[in-house]
Amino acid sequence: MDSGLGSSYPEERSGPPEIRPEEINFEELIGTGSFGKVYKGRCRQKAVAVKLLHKQNFDAATLSAFRKEVHLMSKIYHPNICLFMGACTIPGRCVIVTELVPKGNLETLLHDQKIQLPLYLRMRMARDAALGINWLHESNPVFVHRDIKSSNLLVDENMRVKICDFGLSALKQKHKMLKDQSSAKGTPLYMAPEVMMFKEFNESSDVYSFGIVLWEILTRKEPFSHHRELEKFREAVCVKHERPPIPNDCLDSLRRLIEKCWDKEPISRPSFKEIISALDHVIIDAAISDLNGRDFWKKSFLTEQEVPWEAFIDALCNWSKAPARNQCDKTSIDYLNIKCLKAVLAESPKSEGTGVETVVNIEKFGKILEFFGPVPEPAPGHSIMDTVREILSQKWFHGDLDTTEAASRLNGQPIGSFLIRFSSTNAGCFTISQVVDGGSIKHQRVSRQGVKFNYQNVIYNSLIEIVSKNGGGANGDVKLDSQLGVPNYKFMSLFCVLNKESEVYQ
């Protein structure tokens, strides 16, 4: 529907971001806050978000302050801050126009348990938010957001997070303090104790709020959900120093960060620069469970979550004390090791135009280590690459395959035919898919018990041993026979001897 705001506007403009009322078309309502309603809309042929302010009867001083805020907001540019595109500052018609962030706010995503959000992804989202807030805090003058909460973190189509809603933001010079005079501004559940107690505060109040958000991102629960009365809540947080309970299985690095952020002493809280650095470690811990794998990634790519294959393999060879790729003979085991690891780990970059053919993603690296780990201590003579090569050399190993594709490859094969693949539901586990009596396909899990493998309640030292010892056969099933392994020609081709003088390393 049309905004209905009329077409008259003053000739004097407040600056480049001023938008005429007739340029804005309102569509459906997508959110409501204390200062206004947010609509999906269109402006100058672009899909946008339009915030219609509840309060429109501005006096001259308030209108001047609003226009000043609009002017300041127009100068904030950062990938993790919702892009301010303009505003109408005409009295009675005040709206703010921003980019439209399609997946809504983080609060809604977190509390919808049907949506899968792995811890690694959630911690990456937390880092995005920290990057945006850090940009505000490092500005001059300093922006103190004052209302950091999960509903003010928007999520785009790539699951990247952007800070929004600067309605309560305060500007201050560095090293200066702020103080509320009449009422504490912000959302009580996320509000720092010093703000609730009308004490002086600074940007560290945003750090406290972020600590509560970080707990919410971790647990996917509402903070302080048992509190109902504001006064009792204020006493619990400000006097008794109550904080939400951190789960026992929380990563140690994440626990330490949360506790630092919501410290009762503002001066003890970290800056957002320090928070970002801590989250770099947390993200690696969340993506990689193998301790040596974590050590490798932190020493090699601490701030990166995706790296070019060449940079990755050079770093891994150096860390594991294996021969460098440019020193390997094409017929050597070391060269074959590199080819095999690339076959299961490297993938095309998600972003176009990078100029890089293949990359390694930290999350996939962590999963591969769960399948082939643990990673041995760095030493000449054996590395994780040897383990990968040994498994890929078995004709029956098919790697990353879902149930449907596994059944397709076994269709029409003799009874007893089988293949082994990664489990599609349990990281670190494998699945044996086999043709049984009647020609149907049966899928059975091989679980990990430390470095050993459990198949049908029998413990084996390796996948290869399960096959070589003719594992299985319980409950009338067919025992495994290596002769009936269905070949995976993709992996088998890696083991062809290279003779061409002109062949270059791939």
Swiss-Prot record:
The active site is at residue 147. Its main location: membrane. SMART domains: S_TKc, SH2. One of its GO terms (molecular function) is protein serine/threonine kinase activity. Residues 396-488 form the SH2 domain. InterPro entries: Kinase-like_dom_sf (IPR011009), Prot_kinase_dom (IPR000719), Protein_kinase_ATP_BS (IPR017441), Ser-Thr/Tyr_kinase_cat_dom (IPR001245), Ser/Thr_kinase_AS (IPR008271), Ser/Thr_Kinases-Pseudokinases (IPR051681), SH2 (IPR000980), SH2_dom_sf (IPR036860). The keyword Secreted does not apply. It is an enzyme of class 2 (transferase). ATP binds at residues 30-38, 51. The keyword Nucleotide-binding applies. Gene3D superfamilies: Phosphorylase Kinase, domain 1, SH2 domain, Transferase(Phosphotransferase) domain 1. Keywords: ATP-binding, Kinase, Membrane, Nucleotide-binding, Serine/threonine-protein kinase, Transferase, Tyrosine-protein kinase. Its EC number is 2.7.11.1. It is found in: Membrane. It catalyses: L-seryl-[protein] + ATP = O-phospho-L-seryl-[protein] + ADP + H(+); L-threonyl-[protein] + ATP = O-phospho-L-threonyl-[protein] + ADP + H(+). Residues 24-284 form the Protein kinase domain. GO terms for biological process: signal transduction. Residues 1-21 are annotated as: Disordered. Residues 10-21 have a biased composition (Basic and acidic residues). GO terms for cellular component: cytoplasm; membrane. PROSITE patterns: PROTEIN_KINASE_ATP, PROTEIN_KINASE_DOM, PROTEIN_KINASE_ST, SH2. Belongs to the protein kinase superfamily. TKL Ser/Thr protein kinase family. SH2 domain-containing protein kinase subfamily. Required for proper chemotaxis and phagocytosis; proper spatiotemporal control of F-actin levels in chemotaxing cells. Negative regulator of the PI3K (phosphatidylinositol 3 kinase) pathway. Predominantly phosphorylates serines and threonines and tyrosines at a lower level. This is Dual specificity protein kinase shkC.
